[in-house]
């Protein structure tokens, strides 16, 4: 009998009969391992627990303890959902798009035609059918089929036919079979439906097929799947909290911004309250950059297309750019997708000396990205954005010093915005796949070592990620945890050795020769104003610190006739001091007006009655506090100004 030889991660080699599946392999090691084994890998490709191991090679068992195992469970849960829908008569003729796992869950895109759309009211029936299939404990088996077989098998589902038709002619096509249900699948599932015990359907939303608005609108059914019910419950609770923090909901409730089809998808309109928050962020960041030696500029939002051909954006980034505008006579203008070529023009508009370096150029630069309709979300994914952008041109030997300077400024900004949950990622090129990166081995080795040394000098913890570098140089990414639990890149410092070559940037060195090449550092401290404001809205849950709050002081006279003049005088003094204050003139009960101020999350509410007018005092109620304080107005003004000046942190922080 023929045999196969399997090499395990610890280097051990075992021989098994040809035709063996991963399950007896796991059992040969231990029964407990077999019970925990979710799937297997041969040379990095998934092999189901009931599938034949096709050849000898490097072999690994995936258990419930492995991080990737939860993704396999969630992927299988999407298949379970589809199988359950097909068993319910009113959904029996449903068509299916794609059903992947995602962070914290899964979804499946479905199309049931004009009638019998899925609603949340259907979820109990669908979940009951899913649990029934779980009890059947159907083995999940993969097998390879021909293209002709696949087209015949899925002939009634136009979406599956489209997926099959898009595959290269020589692509292997595999299916996953569980009882009466068949899925197009490349592998990576649990052994049987009995493993998918703990799940919950959460929502249904519209989604264009393949994210294009010209394609049919499908229904995307979302769900959660975990190994334990307690984890499902925790995820549902987290999502309820997420709804309360969703910047789109808070933005609507607090009149911060809106989006509309009349204006255009992905083009948010900033209302006065939201514009005030954004303006405070912009003023803050400009002042911070000016204090750190940056020169602020304004550059056009439109540029000659040739600029982006020289930079390489047109070749590598064209799908994310809007079509060029033909101005006639061979001139084409392009909405810029990035600011760096414009800042290179600022550097290059006159000869530069080493004595001027580093030259730090910054801008709140408006950019445009051709985002698909299906990807657009509130402020966080838009088509027009303003980036807190900066570029430094530095001598190669001063690179490390400049990197540390940028990072120190960045951490100061995080402190002022009370951003504490983040980690640093040093992103290097992939040493096993160097051909996709800028071709200079010496540069890569030196620059990666410089970034690592700078982080060590600053005594900052970081992790290293090979293969995450940009093609033109290594970078530092700051990964922040959002209030909704996801991780995003907020800030970045990227080394660029390529664009200075493409644009032939030089400076005059100490030797008097104008042939020295600077290194370019791209850096973004808070990213785009849109995404950063969305982050702040969700982090603060709309209860902004005083310095950022759209309205800082709500003044409520007990009687507008008797106390209105004093209220207006207080407002005038606060506004003269640079504060944002408003006198409430509505005719309503005092309790209602105070509650409304608290609902609107205004940091300070002042109540003015006879005693306050007579004593030139104010009665102060701070947001989130039940107690009130009566104090001299001058003392209150000093307190709130100190609050603003200290970015609303405790004075001794």
From Swiss-Prot:
Localization annotation: Cytoplasm
One GO cellular component term noted in the UniProt record for this chain: cytoplasm
Segments of this protein annotated with the region Catalytic: 246-545
Cofactors named for this entry: Zn(2+)
Cofactor: record remark: Binds 1 zinc ion per subunit.
InterPro entries linked: aa-tRNA-synt_IIb, aa-tRNA-synth_II, aa-tRNA-synth_II/BPL/LPL, Anticodon-bd, Anticodon-bd_dom_sf, Beta-grasp_dom_sf, TGS, TGS-like
Entry's EC annotation: 6.1.1.3
The UniProt record lists the keyword Ligase: yes
Keywords, ordered alphabetically: Aminoacyl-tRNA synthetase, ATP-binding, Cytoplasm, Ligase, Metal-binding, Nucleotide-binding, Protein biosynthesis, RNA-binding, tRNA-binding, Zinc
Domain TGS: 1-63
Domain of life: Bacteria
Catalytic activity of the protein: tRNA(Thr) + L-threonine + ATP = L-threonyl-tRNA(Thr) + AMP + diphosphate + H(+)
Pfam families: HGTP_anticodon, TGS, tRNA-synt_2b, tRNA_SAD
One of the GO BP terms on file: threonyl-tRNA aminoacylation
Keyword Nucleotide-binding attributed: yes
Residues annotated as binding Zn(2+): 340, 391, 522
UniProt xrefs under PANTHER family: THREONINE--TRNA LIGASE 1, THREONINE-TRNA LIGASE
Similarity field: Belongs to the class-II aminoacyl-tRNA synthetase family.
Self-association and partners: Homodimer.
Function: Catalyzes the attachment of threonine to tRNA(Thr) in a two-step reaction: L-threonine is first activated by ATP to form Thr-AMP and then transferred to the acceptor end of tRNA(Thr). Also edits incorrectly charged L-seryl-tRNA(Thr).
Protein name per the record: Threonine--tRNA ligase
Organism: Leuconostoc citreum (strain KM20)
Lineage: Bacteria, Bacillati, Bacillota, Bacilli, Lactobacillales
């Amino acid at each position: 009998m023929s045999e196969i030889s399997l090499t395990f991660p610890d280097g051990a080699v075992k021989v098994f009969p040809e035709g063996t599946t991963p399950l007896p392999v796991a059992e040969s090691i231990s029964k407990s391992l077999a019970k925990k084994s979710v799937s297997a890998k041969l040379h990095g490709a998934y092999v189901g627990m009931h599938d034949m191991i096709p050849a000898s090679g490097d072999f690994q068992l995936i258990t419930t303890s492995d991080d990737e195992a939860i993704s396999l469970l969630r992927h299988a849960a999407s298949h379970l959902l589809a199988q359950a829908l097909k068993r319910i008569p009113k959904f029996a003729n449903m068509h299916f798009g794609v059903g992947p796992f995602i962070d914290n869950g899964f979804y499946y895109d479905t199309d049931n035609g004009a009638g019998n759309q899925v609603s949340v009211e259907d979820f109990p029936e669908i979940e009951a059918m899913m649990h029934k299939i779980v009890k059947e404990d159907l083995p999940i088996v993969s097998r390879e089929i021909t293209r002709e077989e696949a087209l015949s098998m899925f002939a009634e589902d136009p979406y599956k036919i489209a997926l099959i038709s898009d595959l290269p002619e020589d692509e292997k096509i595999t299916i996953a079979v569980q009882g009466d249900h068949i899925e197009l699948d490349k592998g990576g599932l649990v052994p049987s439906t009995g493993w998918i015990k703990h799940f919950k359907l959460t929502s249904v939303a519209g989604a264009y097929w393949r994210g294009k608005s010209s394609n049919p609108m499908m229904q995307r059914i979302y769900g959660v799947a975990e190994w334990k019910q307690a984890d499902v419950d925790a995820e549902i609770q987290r999502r309820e909290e997420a709804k309360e923090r969703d910047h789109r909901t808070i933005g609507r409730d607090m009149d911060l911004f809106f989006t509309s089809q009349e204006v255009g998808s992905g083009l948010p309109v900033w209302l006065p309250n939201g514009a005030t928050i954004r303006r405070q962020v912009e003023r803050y960041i400009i002042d911070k950059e000016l204090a750190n030696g940056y020169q602020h500029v304004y550059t056009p939002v439109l540029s000659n297309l040739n600029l982006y051909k020289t930079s390489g954006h047109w070749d590598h980034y064209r799908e994310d750019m809007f079509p060029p505008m033909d101005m006639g006579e061979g001139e084409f203008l392009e909405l810029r997708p990035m600011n760096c070529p414009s800042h290179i023009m600022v550097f290059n508009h006159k000869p530069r000396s080493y004595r001027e370096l580093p030259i730090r150029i910054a801008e709140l630069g408006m950019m445009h990205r051709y985002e698909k309709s299906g990807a657009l979300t509130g402020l966080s994914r838009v088509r027009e954005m303003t980036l807190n952008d900066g570029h430094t041109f530095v001598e190669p030997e001063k690179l490390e010093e400049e990197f540390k300077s940028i990072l120190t400024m960045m951490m100061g900004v995080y402190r002022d915005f009370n951003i504490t949950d983040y980690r640093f990622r040093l992103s290097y090129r992939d040493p096993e796949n160097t051909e996709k990166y800028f071709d200079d081995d010496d540069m890569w080795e030196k620059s990666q070592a410089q970034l690592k040394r700078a982080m060590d000098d600053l005594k900052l913890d970081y992790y290293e990620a090979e293969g995450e570098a940009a093609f033109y140089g290594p970078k530092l990414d700051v990964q922040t945890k959002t209030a909704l639990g996801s991780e995003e890149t907020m800030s970045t410092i990227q080394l660029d050795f390529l664009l200075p070559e493409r644009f032939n940037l030089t400076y005059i060195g100490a030797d008097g020769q104008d042939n020295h090449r600077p290194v370019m550092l791209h850096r973004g401290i808070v990213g785009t104003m849109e995404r950063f404001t969305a982050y702040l809205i969700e982090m603060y849950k709309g209860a902004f610190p005083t310095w950022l709050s759209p309205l800082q002081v709500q003044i409520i006279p007990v009687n507008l006739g008797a106390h209105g003049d004093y209220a207006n005088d207080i407002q005038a003094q606060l506004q003269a001091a640079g504060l944002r204050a408003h006198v409430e003139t509505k005719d309503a009960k005092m309790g209602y007006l105070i509650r409304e101020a608290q609902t609107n999350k205004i940091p300070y509410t002042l109540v003015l009655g006879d005693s306050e007018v007579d004593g030139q005092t104010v009665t102060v109620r701070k947001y989130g506090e039940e107690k009130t304080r009566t104090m001299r107005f001058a003392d209150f003004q000093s307190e709130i100004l100190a609050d603003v000046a200290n970015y609303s942190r405790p004075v001794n922080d």
